[in-house]
A protein has these predicted regions:
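Beta-rich, blade/repeat-based domains predominating
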Residues: 18-34, 62-77, 81, 103-130, ...
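Beta-propeller domains
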Residues: 38-57
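Short loop/turn segments that connect beta-strands within beta-propeller blades
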Residues: 49-54, 91-95, 137-141, 180-185, ...
C-alpha cells in the first residue's frame, strides 16, 4: 500500500531530548482550547507546548507514567496513569493535579470526555480478552465498568462524529471497533468498524469532516479511513525517526500532531500536502 504523503510532510515540532522539562517518550498528545499542544511522559510529567513549538513547560506531574489525555471545554485535563492505575485531573483554575478516579480499572489507557451526558469514558488495556471501557461521573469520579467486552487490548478511543457511540482500538486483533450508546446510556453491542489495521494500531482521531485517522505503535505509520470507503495509508516512517512509534494523534486545522513513544519529541504533519485527495 503506497502512502498518500511522503515522510517529508512530517517534521520534528519540538525536540525535548535534553530540555527541562524533558519530553521523555511521550505516549499521549492533545490540543488545548487555547491552541497549545500538551503531552504526557513516562515519568508522569504533563507538559504544555506553545502553539508555535518554540517553548514548553511543566504544568503538573503524577510521578507515574502518563498515557492518553483529553481536555474538557473549560481546559481541565484528564490523563490516564499506568503506574498508579488511575485517572488524574489537572484543574485549570487551581493549577493542581489530583487523582480523579480509579475504581476497578487496571490499565487506564485513554479518556474520552462526554460533557453532554456528564461522563468520562476510559479504555482498560488489561487482559486478553479483557474488560473494555469504564465510565466515571465527571463531577464525582464515581463509576465502574460500562462496556464489559470482551475486548483484546482496548486502546485509543474517539467519540463518534454523531456522538451516538465510541470508536476504540483493539490492538491485539488488530482493528477498530464501535460500541453505540443505548437510549438509557448503557453500552450496546460491539461491532467491527475497521479491519486489517496492521500491525499494532494504537490511537484514533476524527477530523471535522468525519475522516478517521488511526496511528500505529508498530510499524510507525498512520492510516486514513473514510465512511463507506477503504483503509488508506496516510504516511509511514520506515526508519522510525521523525515518527517513532506514534501512539496517539491530535488534529488542529491542517496540522496533525503525534506523540512518539520511541523518542523524545512531538511530530507535526502537514495535511495540506494532500491537496484535496
Amino acid at each position: 500500500m503506497k502512502a498518500l504523503l511522503d515522510i517529508s510532510a512530517a517534521r520534528v515540532f519540538v525536540d525535548g531530548i535534553f530540555s527541562r522539562p524533558r519530553i521523555a517518550h511521550p505516549e499521549g498528545v492533545a490540543i488545548h482550547p487555547d491552541g497549545s499542544i500538551w503531552c504526557g511522559t513516562e515519568v508522569g510529567d504533563l507538559i504544555r507546548i506553545d502553539a508555535d513549538g518554540k517553548s514548553h513547560s511543566l504544568v503538573g506531574t503524577t510521578a507515574g507514567f502518563l498515557l492518553g489525555l483529553a481536555f474538557d471545554k473549560a481546559g481541565n485535563c484528564f490523563v490516564c496513569d499506568l503506574k498508579h492505575a488511575a485517572i488524574f485531573r489537572y484543574d485549570a483554575a487551581t493549577k493542581r493535579m489530583e487523582r480523579f478516579a480509579a475504581a476497578g480499572i487496571q490499565v487506564p489507557n485513554y479518556p474520552v470526555i462526554d460533557e453532554e451526558r456528564g461522563f468520562l469514558y476510559v479504555s482498560d488495556s488489561s487482559g486478553d480478552p479483557g474488560v473494555g471501557i469504564y465510565r466515571y461521573d465527571l463531577k464525582t469520579g464515581a463509576g465502574g465498568v460500562w462496556c464489559p467486552g470482551p475486548t483484546r487490548f482496548a486502546n485509543g478511543m474517539a467519540m463518534a462524529p454523531d456522538r451516538k457511540g465510541l470508536y476504540f482500538v483493539e490492538s491485539h486483533v488488530p482493528c477498530v471497533s464501535y460500541v453505540p450508546f443505548e437510549a438509557d446510556g448503557a453500552a450496546g453491542e460491539i461491532r467491527r468498524a475497521v479491519s486489517d489495521v496492521e500491525n499494532v494500531p494504537d490511537g484514533l482521531a476524527f477530523a471535522p469532516d468525519g475522516t478517521l485517522y488511526i496511528c500505529c505503535y508498530e510499524p510507525s505509520r498512520i492510516y486514513r479511513f473514510r465512511t463507506g470507503g477503504k483503509l488508506e495509508l496516510l504516511i509511514e516512517d520506515r526508519k522510525a525517526t521523525t515518527m517513532a512509534h506514534p501512539t496517539n494523534i491530535a488534529l488542529k486545522g491542517t496540522r496533525m500532531y503525534t506523540s512518539n513513544l520511541g523518542r523524545w519529541h512531538i511530530t507535526e504533519i502537514d495535511l495540506s500536502a494532500l491537496n484535496g485527495r
